Each structure stands twice: as structure tokens, then as C-alpha cells.
């Protein structure tokens, strides 16, 4: 059985839209890449898939070597299969599809992106761990994660600061408080 781990990169003020603030080298970058080693695959929604699939297949280097061959699972109400970039479309209800994947796969399933799909999975209690890679910058305008109505309590399981100033915050969800 797989655990579902959400992993996202953000600024101190919560901006997840990657910009000039992103620090892409050093010990934290290796640690971020290593979270995919031995995983069952990547999980993402349509918007994240379209952005990543439009970029990574033509890239080379350590990140590309790690990400390109990995199995990817994509939830979408509008995409139709077959998908490119070693990706499989989750058919039908996304939450039920993720439950099936968690039951069938061996190794962590890493969820990339913090939009509507991630929020839905968090509200359904399907995310086992959240990893926030917080970069030492405040960026102001931009997309923020988990904009929604539900309130979720988290328990900190690790905080690690790297030489670059990037901090990894690992949490487990504890309770969802309805409105």
C-alpha cells in the first residue's frame, strides 16, 4: 500500500508560482529530488500535468533523469487518454482513483501541485503527509496553495533547514474542521 505525499515548493509568504526566488542548487535540491527515489510515481492534476509535460520531456540532467521515466498519474475532468510523458489518466472519480492507486502501488505516491485537486484529496483524508519546501523569499502576488473553505490541523513531524536557507517542513494532517 502506498502513502500519498504532497510535495510543494513555496516562498515564506506562501507563493507557489515559481519565479526568480526559486533556489535550484545545493543540498536541499538533492534532498527534494531524492524524495522521488523509490516512489511508485507522481500524481498531479491537469494544470500541473500540462505545465510539466510541456517542459520536462525535452530536458536533460539529474532532475530530468529522475522525473522523465517515472510513472505519472493525472486526474482531469477534461483530458482524454492516452497521455504522453509516461502518464496515465485517472478514469472516473478522482478520489476513488487515488484510493485504488494507494491500495495497488508499492512505494510513496508523490503529489505535485497545490490546486483544486490537492485540496480535494486533503479534504477527503487521502493525503498522508505534506512537505513544504520553503524558500527564503517573500514574493507578494502569485498563486497560493489550498485556497478553500476547510480548515485542516497539521502535526509537524520534521523541520530541516539547509545551507541555502530553504527549510523543509513535513506535516501529517490530523483533523479537518468543517465550516
Predicted regions and their residues:
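Enzymes that bind and transform nitrogen-containing heteroaromatic metabolites
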Residues: 1-179
